[in-house]
């Protein structure tokens, strides 16, 4: 039996499915890679040096402007057929949830719910000082003109600077997000890991967490992730091709609207 048929059988037998997603699921959505498509002002900067609390303390205007630009790039991207396959499975009767390492909002725009963001979201803003979430107007979130830097807005409660609601390097995962992820994974009977690197802890331990409670794990990746468990199934290929094929093999129609990459 092929791995695709094995995966389809596992999906048919399941009731509660968690999709655990990483950068690979958004690869076909046109979100620019940092190094290949940086232009103008941002070509001078190493993105990893801008994604720390120390960088924000040293130059909050530069870091805030960088994230406004990133947010704009994400807003121009569209959910691809991999994102769209997940709510299609939910519509067909499965209990489906998403735990993602991505900071884009493509799962939400595809129609998935609930979505747990382990690393925060570019769409969220919080105070650097008191850590409370904040709401901003569209004007305050407008992308800066080329070469222009914008001072971050201030918190209405403590007057601290506002920052992106993402997890920076050397920061811990949000407690609420991690607890929600653990609860969902421990309650699932099938986990589909899509486009994850498998190296960033503690999130990299999520597939093993699912296996420990008796769930089957399907890995979707461009290359073999080196799994060795009897309850693991490897599907190699782009997520935008593999997930629709899995749904079709299971008997669920997985059609993409015009203009969506497949």
Swiss-Prot record:
Pfam family, one: SIR2
Alphabetical keyword list: Cytoplasm, Metal-binding, NAD, Transferase, Zinc
Coiled coil feature spans: none
Gene3D superfamilies: SIR2/SIRT2 'Small Domain (3.30.1600.10), TPP-binding domain (3.40.50.1220)
Top EC class for this record: transferase
UniProt keyword ATP-binding present: no
Enzyme Commission number, as recorded: 2.3.1.286
Reactions catalysed: N(6)-acetyl-L-lysyl-[protein] + NAD(+) + H2O = 2''-O-acetyl-ADP-D-ribose + nicotinamide + L-lysyl-[protein]; N(6)-succinyl-L-lysyl-[protein] + NAD(+) + H2O = 2''-O-succinyl-ADP-D-ribose + nicotinamide + L-lysyl-[protein]
Main location: cytoplasm
InterPro entries, A to Z: DHS-like_NAD/FAD-binding_dom (IPR029035), NAD-dep_sirtuin_deacylases (IPR050134), Sirtuin (IPR003000), Sirtuin_cat_small_dom_sf (IPR026591), Sirtuin_class_III (IPR027546), Ssirtuin_cat_dom (IPR026590)
Disulfide bond positions: none
GO CC list: cytoplasm
Keyword Transmembrane helix included in the entry's annotation: no
Gene Ontology molecular-function annotations: histone deacetylase activity, NAD-dependent; NAD+ binding; protein-malonyllysine demalonylase activity; protein-succinyllysine desuccinylase activity; zinc ion binding
Cofactors: Zn(2+)
Domain Deacetylase sirtuin-type: 1-262
Subcellular localization, as worded in the UniProt entry: Cytoplasm
Residue sites binding substrate per the record: 67, 70
Active site: 119 (proton acceptor)
Annotated NAD(+) binding sites: 22-42, 101-104, 195-197, 221-223, 239
Annotated residues for binding of Zn(2+): 127, 130, 155, 158
Cofactor remark: Binds 1 zinc ion per subunit.
Entry text on domains: 2 residues (Tyr-67 and Arg-70) present in a large hydrophobic pocket are probably involved in substrate specificity. They are important for desuccinylation activity, but dispensable for deacetylation activity.
Protein family membership: Belongs to the sirtuin family. Class III subfamily.
Task performed by this protein: NAD-dependent lysine deacetylase and desuccinylase that specifically removes acetyl and succinyl groups on target proteins. Modulates the activities of several proteins which are inactive in their acylated form.
Name of this chain's protein: NAD-dependent protein deacylase
Organism listed in the record: Pseudomonas putida (strain ATCC 47054 / DSM 6125 / CFBP 8728 / NCIMB 11950 / KT2440)
């Amino acid at each position: 039996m092929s791995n695709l048929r094995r995966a389809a059988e596992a999906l048919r037998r399941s009731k509660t499915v968690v999709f655990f997603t990483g950068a690979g699921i958004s690869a076909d959505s046109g979100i620019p890679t940092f190094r290949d498509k940086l232009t103008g002002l941002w070509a001078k900067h190493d993105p990893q040096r801008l994604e720390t609390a120390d960088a924000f303390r040293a130059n909050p205007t530069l870091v805030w402007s960088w994230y406004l630009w990133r947010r704009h790039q994400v807003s121009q991207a569209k959910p691809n057929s991999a994102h769209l396959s997940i709510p299609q499975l939910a519509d067909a009767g499965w209990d489906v949830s998403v735990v993602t390492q991505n900071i884009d909002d493509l799962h939400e725009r595809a129609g998935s719910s609930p979505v747990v963001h382990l690393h925060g979201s570019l769409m969220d803003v919080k105070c650097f000082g008191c850590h409370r979430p904040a709401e901003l107007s569209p004007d305050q979130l407008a992308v800066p003109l080329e070469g222009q830097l914008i001072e971050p807005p201030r918190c209405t409660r403590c007057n601290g600077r506002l920052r992106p609601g993402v997890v920076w390097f050397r920061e811990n995962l949000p407690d609420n997000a991690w607890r929600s992820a653990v609860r969902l994974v421990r309650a699932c009977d099938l986990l589909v890991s899509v486009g994850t690197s498998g190296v960033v802890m503690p999130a990299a331990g999520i597939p093993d967490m699912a296996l420990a409670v008796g769930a089957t794990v399907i890995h979707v990746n461009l290359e073999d992730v080196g799994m060795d468990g009897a309850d693991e199934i490897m599907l190699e290929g782009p997520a935008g091709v593999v997930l629709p094929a899995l749904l079709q093999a299971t008997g669920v129609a997985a059609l993409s609207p015009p203009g969506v990459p497949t």
